[in-house]
Amino acid sequence: MALRWGIVSAGLIANDFTTVLSSLPSSEHQVVAVAARDLNRAEEFAQKFNIPKAYGSYEELAKDPNVEVAYIATQHPQHKPAVLLCLAAGKAVLCEKPMGVNAAEVREMVAKARSQGVFLMEAIWSRFFPAMEALREVLVQGTIGDLRVARAEFGFDLSHIPRATDWNQAGGGLLDLGIYCVQFLSMIFGAQKPEKISAVGRIHETGVDDTVSVLLQYPGGVHGSFTCSISSNLPNTAYVSGTKGMAQIQKLWAPTELVVNGERKEFPPPVLGKDYNFVNGSCMLYEANHVRECLRKGLKESPVVPLAESELLAEILEEARKAIGVTFPQDKR
């Protein structure tokens, strides 16, 4: 039976996710509604993807009885109200990353999902790529021995994108790009809470974090580190080293190859749909299918991206951000 999706926002990432859903068998996924704050945008989006309902408010979509799961694709400062709205209406929710601007927002969303008994998941799509699944298998098998250190880097020059440097919209590198790095380290070290978090960084003239390096000390004497930047291009790779070798991931946010002890294995993206805004956009299908599987099993959260880990990721990002002196308007609410 098809999973019935409602798309909240008609932006770029919503376009890519809907392109994927529309390319999958209609017996598995159907997009039944889209909502944007501008009805014209919602109607254009609906026309493009042949979606039966277009709404000019998120409230209308939340009330639509035909919507089974809402995909929240707004900018991250708008995630919390949209998520709470849909959860209150009894909709399952897949929310884009980062789920919230700070840990308090994420905790509030998680608490609401649990009190409502409704499914909620942070859309950390990278975790579902076959290359990342293969890396997890490498760790389980002990191929690289006992873990010692992991590192991730993610940086692009985004200074030409107004949202990236907008303090009111919680711009900056940590929330936009750092989430990919910290989720990688958390995956490697089993979602443990770091014993110590330290950070150094450069603050942009608008007050957002520009380029930040973070060191995470984990139990057992192992550690991870990452650097993210919105003003410079970085290698955008990640690696984990152990007593018997090293595994490397290219394109950390959308990986299609894994190198283990010098042996390279490629995982080509599926040929599905076209005209994506983001690299390897067709790979969103792995995440979509995971949500369907979770809901068909009656799960209230994902075993791959559990809610407690989403809370932890938000705590780490907030602590790192405040360590370099960056606070956002949302922190005062």
From Swiss-Prot:
Residues the UniProt record annotates as site (May play an important role for the adaptation of the alcohol substrate into the binding site): 176
Disulfide bonds: none
Record Gene3D superfamilies: Dihydrodipicolinate Reductase, domain 2, NAD(P)-binding Rossmann-like Domain
Pfam families given in the database record: GFO_IDH_MocA, GFO_IDH_MocA_C3
Keyword Oxidoreductase among record annotations: yes
Species classification: Eukaryota, Metazoa, Chordata, Craniata, Vertebrata
Enzyme Commission code: 1.3.1.20, 1.1.1.179
Site residues, May play an important role in coenzyme binding: 71, 79, 97
Subunit structure, as described in the record: Homodimer.
Protein name in the entry: Trans-1,2-dihydrobenzene-1,2-diol dehydrogenase
Keywords attached to this entry: NADP, Oxidoreductase
Catalytic activity: (1R,2R)-1,2-dihydrobenzene-1,2-diol + NADP(+) = catechol + NADPH + H(+); D-xylose + NADP(+) = D-xylono-1,5-lactone + NADPH + H(+)
GO molecular function, one term: D-xylose 1-dehydrogenase (NADP+) activity
Residues with site note (May play an important role in catalytic activity): 180
Organism: Mus musculus (Mouse)
Residue stretches spanning the membrane: none
BP-aspect Gene Ontology terms: D-xylose catabolic process
InterPro entries: Gfo/Idh/MocA-like_OxRdtase_N, Gfo/Idh/MocA_domain, GFO_IDH_MocA-like_dom, NAD(P)-bd_dom_sf
Family: Belongs to the Gfo/Idh/MocA family.
